[in-house]
């Protein structure tokens, strides 16, 4: 796992000094603390800090197209010879790469048979030779998580690619003379004259989803390369293309786990279980390839317990597992994690922390680059900090919910669909104002609150209904917040299009499957995977996700929804397939989630900061929000008339982010203090 950054150009005005790319890589040093190097096309070789510059700041002259590739390395595989940027045999193709290619050993013999000569044992070099052999189609051969940039010195072009699910991030900006790119936005901001104009469209999207979705960026003119896309920069033009999609529109695969064709595409439930066990076991085994210590996150939920259990079965000694706990019972899963660890026989590490929002906020804001208000980033940061003390690589259960119907909202989607088919007169009663008479609750996940939300949205189309369930601020609330001037800047932009486009991917499937597909294309890469990547890389920890192996994802996408979702809940096939790895209490427990007590914080330790942040004259002077609307949200939350904790967190994060990234003339230095004192339990 590493960090990448660089610049490419196509005109004589484009060449850049080494020092610019060194600055771009230095600001993401946390992603790769073990080594740093750059490649400069003017001399066609790799440089370290000790080498004289290829082009000094006062002498940036070079004819024709070129590139500088930067790399920060976290050593995982081939510790001795895997330095990057790395080249092919004749040094005509250079790569800077972030991620892991798990099937690199399987790919190598065929490439060697085709005449390619390997100089290292790294997975990185496999990509270089695949590109030589297949060009942009090289991505179709890769099994792993990745973003990379390849400079093709013969064709004078830059090739960028991102993995299928979107586990690794890639930002880029195109201007008249340059294409700049990097693993994090802060790297691009090191480029001289990098603009920082706030995008009104991105703010509107952020307040809808709690993140800024691809391909948008919080600053105008910057973009995120979408998952399963590659980009080609040549002759000053940038072409992007999609190379993969989850096959929700297809039926059961016509091949088995051994690669041979099956006689029929109509599988029995037992056949599905057999294929699932084989495919997920293979995904776990591939992700255990490492030349450094590895372990697993273990929350005591179904997904992380299955991953930990498979790792333990594949290991000759107890694996390391890690869980984090909190003093507040409703947010603490350590008892389940402890039970799972004892059941599986792992070497378990458990810590209880008392999170202090005031101390963690600066670190969150600096690392996340863009506004990002999923509060589970807080415990994910704590867990990553604790895990990195023991191992360099951790496997996680991320993706199990989206692939196998783990969220309660998928059940709600199914219930709402059945209610949609009721006679019109019954729906008329359910959609009438009678639902407003149900006593309310300020608890985010109370059954009364869920029933009210379900009935309130029955009259809408399924896609719009789902958006109302998952958004932070709906259209009406956002428009009530915005000042006249900012509303005009947002204009007619429709934040729902991002989700609706994802729903359109598989129109012929049942609506629960369509919803899972939409989440895999939107919420999973933009929220869950972004959260985990940033939090883990803040501590130079590599996180691997077996459920997000594209072979597992393809199998799950084709699977009939009734195998995943039953009347009692989701993940039915996971529980039945891996029953031997799951303690009975974990098979039947309710999903807890990974959260913090935001509502209490905003009535306690965070209230002064909340008011100072949102109602400060300098904040209001930005002209984005109406002061009276902000005050109303705070008052309603204070008086427990409504739980606005997620909305207030989103607004506070946005303002503090602007103070960090918009107001200063340069991106700030990273906070150096630890998150908080951590109480050791076991």
What are these regions (language model features)?
Residues 1-368, 380, 384, 579-580, ...:
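Cysteine-centered catalytic environments shared across enzyme families
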Residues 365-367, 408-415, 668-669:
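Short secondary-structure boundary/capping segments
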Residues 127, 383, 436-454:
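Glycine-rich phosphate-binding/catalytic subdomain of phosphoryl-transfer
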Residues 1-4, 42, 52, 57, ...:
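Adenosyl-5′-phosphate
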Residues 328, 352, 371-374, 421, ...:
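Alpha-helix capping and helix-loop boundary segments enriched in small/acidic/polar residues
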Residues 188, 323-324, 370, 414-422:
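Short beta-alpha connecting loops at secondary-structure transitions
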Residues 343-346, 369-375, 439-445:
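A polyampholytic, Gly/Pro-enriched intrinsically disordered region
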Residues 83, 164, 176, 382-442, ...:
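Active-site adenylate/phosphate-handling loop in enzymes that bind or generate adenylated species
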């Amino acid at each position: 796992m590493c960090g990448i950054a660089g610049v490419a150009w196509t005109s004589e005005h484009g060449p850049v000094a080494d020092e610019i790319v060194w600055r771009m890589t230095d600001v993401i040093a946390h992603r790769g603390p073990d080594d740093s190097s750059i490649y400069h096309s003017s001399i066609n070789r790799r440089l370290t800090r000790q080498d004289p510059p290829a082009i000094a700041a006062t002498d940036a002259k070079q004819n024709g197209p070129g590139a500088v590739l930067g790399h920060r390395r976290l050593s995982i595989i081939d510790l001795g010879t895997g330095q990057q940027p790395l080249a092919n045999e004749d040094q005509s193709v250079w790569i800077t790469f972030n991620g892991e290619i798990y099937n690199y050993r399987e790919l190598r013999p065929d490439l060697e048979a085709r005449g390619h000569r390997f100089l290292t044992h790294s997975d990185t070099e496999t990509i270089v030779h695949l590109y030589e052999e297949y060009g942009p189609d090289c991505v179709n051969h890769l099994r792993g998580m990745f973003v990379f940039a390849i400079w093709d010195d013969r064709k004078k072009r830059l090739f960028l690619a991102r993995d299928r699910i979107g586990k690794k991030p890639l930002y880029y900006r195109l201007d008249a003379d340059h294409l700049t790119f990097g693993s994090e936005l802060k790297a691009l901001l090191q480029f001289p004259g990098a603009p920082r104009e706030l995008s009104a469209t991105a703010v509107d999207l952020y307040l809808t989803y709690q993140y800024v979705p691809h391909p948008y960026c919080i600053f105008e003119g910057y973009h995120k390369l979408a998952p399963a896309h590659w980009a080609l920069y040549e002759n000053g033009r940038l072409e992007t293309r999609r190379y993969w999609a989850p096959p929700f529109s297809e039926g059961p695969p016509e091949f088995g786990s051994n690669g041979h064709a099956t006689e029929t595409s109509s599988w029995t439930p037992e056949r599905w279980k057999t294929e699932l066990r084989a495919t997920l076991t293979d995904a776990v085994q591939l992700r255990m390839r490492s030349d450094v210590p590895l372990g697993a996150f273990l929350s005591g939920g179904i997904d992380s317990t299955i991953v930990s259990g498979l790792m333990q079965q594949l290991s000759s000694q107890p694996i390391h597992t890690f869980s984090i706990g909190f003093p507040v019972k409703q947010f603490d899963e350590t008892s389940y994690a402890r039970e799972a660890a004892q059941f599986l026989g792992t070497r378990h590490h458990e810590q209880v922390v008392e999170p202090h929002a005031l101390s963690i906020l600066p670190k969150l804001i600096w690392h996340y680059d863009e506004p990002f208000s999923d509060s589970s980033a807080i415990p994910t940061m704590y867990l990553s900090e604790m895990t990195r003390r023991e191992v360099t690589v951790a496997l996680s259960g991320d993706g199990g919910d989206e692939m196998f119907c783990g969220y309660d909202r998928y059940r709600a989607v199914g219930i709402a669909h059945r209610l949609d088919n009721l006679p019109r007169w019954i729906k008329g009663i359910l959609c009438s104002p009678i639902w407003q008479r149900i006593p309310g609750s300020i608890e985010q996940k109370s059954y009364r609150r869920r029933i009210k939300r379900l009935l309130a949205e029955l009259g809408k189309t399924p896609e719009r209904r789902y958006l109302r369930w998952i958004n932070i601020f709906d259209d009406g609330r956002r428009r009530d917040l915005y000042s006249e001037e900012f509303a005009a800047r947002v204009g007619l932009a429709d934040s729902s299009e991002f989700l609706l486009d994802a729903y359109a991917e598989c129109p012929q499937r049942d609506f629960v499957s369509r919803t899972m597909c939409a989440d895999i294309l939107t919420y999973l890469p933009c929220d869950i995977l972004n959260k985990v990547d940033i939090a883990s890389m803040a501590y130079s920890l590599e996180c691997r996700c077996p459920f997000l192996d594209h072979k597992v994802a393809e199998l799950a996408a084709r699977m009939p929804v009734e195998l995943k979702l039953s009347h009692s809940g989701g993940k039915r096939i996971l529980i039945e397939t891996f029953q031997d790895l799951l303690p009975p209490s974990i098979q039947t427990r309710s999903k807890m989630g990974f959260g913090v007590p935001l509502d209490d914080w905003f009535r306690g330790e965070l209230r002064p900061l909340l008011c100072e942040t949102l109602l400060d004259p300098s904040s209001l002077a930005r002209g984005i929000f109406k002061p009276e609307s902000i005050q109303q949200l705070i008052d309603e939350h204070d008086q427990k008339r409504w739980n606005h904790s997620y909305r207030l967190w989103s607004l506070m994060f946005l303002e503090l982010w602007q103070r960090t990234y918009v107001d200063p003339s340069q991106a700030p230095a990273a906070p150096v203090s630890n998150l908080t004192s951590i109480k050791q339990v076991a």
